[in-house]
Amino acid sequence: MTTVNLAAYRFVSLDSIEQWRPLVAARCNTLGLRGTILLAPEGINLFIAGPREATDAFVDYIRHDPLFEGKFADLPFKESLSDSQPFRRMLVRLKREIITMKKPAIKPELGRAPSVDARTLKAWLDQGHDDASRPVVMLDTRNAFEVDVGTFDRALDYRIDKFSEFPAVIEANRADLEGKTIVSFCTGGIRCEKAAIHMKDVGIENVYQLEGGILKYFEEVGGAHYHGDCFVFDYRTALNPQLAPTADVTCFACRAVVPADAQQSPLYVPGKCCPACHPGDSGTPGRRAEPGAEPARAV
């Protein structure tokens, strides 16, 4: 049976998340959905999967149920299909932030960061500058192991291990951004939106976020100006520019991304180890995920 995978987020001030949590969990369980929904004072971040009938019912629920006071009435969802259920269980969690930066929570009511859509960005990259003739710099806001799976051509990559390091590396590298148009990007939009808001707040000019992230870019224009695939935080591991799962897998032991060629190594033992963590091996490391990372933890 085909499984529908949905991802969505929104920065919006929420005051009733403690009340919502058990009700949302009960509805998801009744529908037979699996995945993770994060609720925080600054908004919602969700990754869920299930049969088409169940996901359609959830979208109708989150957009129209009076419980949510219309806060998600026009919430956009990103959809992809898979042959199996990528999640093991259904979780609804309360968090301080929907994506952890360890800075004061953003104030959604003050407005979101400026954005650029996929087609406009492709046009900028095709011509080598934006509509004001400023050079365009692509800024990858993801963790280093995600970047290693694929990223935009010539993107800035500061090799962060977790998103909470982002403010410090931006402060240390402001000179890279001066006089340019900065387009922050991530998997699905949430990190690059928060990153763009932070840069705007600290006085960096001409900052945009890529609307909908890499996955929306793939959906709209394919893989133009992008090399590799896109890491995703579920059991598909990575998607190609056609939004199809790749042959990459995640090592059971160390969470490294193991591409197809590395799976042929005698050091790769499914469910046990890979070339990045095989005992006593000092060969080519895999693309290691953050220790303890969970599927559906961030986009």
UniProtKB/Swiss-Prot annotation:
Q: Which GO terms describe its molecular function?
A: oxidoreductase activity, acting on paired donors, with incorporation or reduction of molecular oxygen
Q: What class of enzyme is it?
A: oxidoreductase
Q: Which SMART domains match?
A: RHOD
Outline the extent of the Rhodanese domain: 132-226
InterPro entries noted in UniProt:
Rhodanese-like_dom, Rhodanese-like_dom_sf, TrhO, TRHO_N
Record's keyword terms, sorted: Oxidoreductase, tRNA processing
What the protein does comes down to: Catalyzes oxygen-dependent 5-hydroxyuridine (ho5U) modification at position 34 in tRNAs.
Spell out the protein name for this chain: tRNA uridine(34) hydroxylase
Q: Which organism is it from?
A: Burkholderia pseudomallei (strain K96243)
